[in-house]
Swiss-Prot record:
Keywords: Membrane, NAD, NADP, Plastoquinone, Quinone, Thylakoid, Translocase, Transport. PANTHER family: NAD(P)H-QUINONE OXIDOREDUCTASE SUBUNIT M, CHLOROPLASTIC (PTHR36900:SF1). The gene is ndhM. This is NAD(P)H-quinone oxidoreductase subunit M. NDH-1 can be composed of about 15 different subunits; different subcomplexes with different compositions have been identified which probably have different functions. It is found in: Cellular thylakoid membrane. It catalyses: a plastoquinone + NADH + (n+1) H(+)(in) = a plastoquinol + NAD(+) + n H(+)(out); a plastoquinone + NADPH + (n+1) H(+)(in) = a plastoquinol + NADP(+) + n H(+)(out). Belongs to the complex I NdhM subunit family.
Length: 115
């Protein structure tokens, strides 16, 4: 029987119980793969990416020993969404003006004119 690929999808975070092999997802019940902002809604700098990746590692470690199921994947994804929102509200992350659809999904940008 083939391994089942579990996934959790939020607006800016996709988690898979898989590993990437030659550009393809291969189900792996012992590994989580993070796909960050697949729609390129934000302009990412290295610091913000590292912050989210570190938070991902912390969450995975905190859930060690718990079942790798849809519920726990959603919890991790929701926590990561919260981390992204914090970066945006702190002005460390910004919306991508060239995004396919600019909908300000995490609220309006914090600019001096809007504060």
């Amino acid at each position: 029987m083939a391994d089942t690929l579990l996934k959790s999808t939020t607006r800016h975070v996709r988690l898979f119980t898989a590993r990437v092999n030659e550009g393809r997802l291969v189900p792996d019940p012992n590994q989580l793969t993070l796909d960050l902002d697949p729609d390129n809604e934000f302009l990412w700098n290295d610091s913000c990416i590292q912050t989210v990746q570190q938070r991902f590692r912390e969450l995975v470690e905190a859930h060690a020993g718990q079942p790798l199921n849809d519920y726990n994947l959603r919890r991790i994804g929701s926590e990561l969404e919260g981390s992204i929102r914090q970066l945006l509200q702190a002005g460390q992350l910004s919306y991508n003006p060239d995004c396919r659809v600019l909908n300000y999904s995490m609220g309006l940008p914090r600019t001096p004119e809007l504060l």
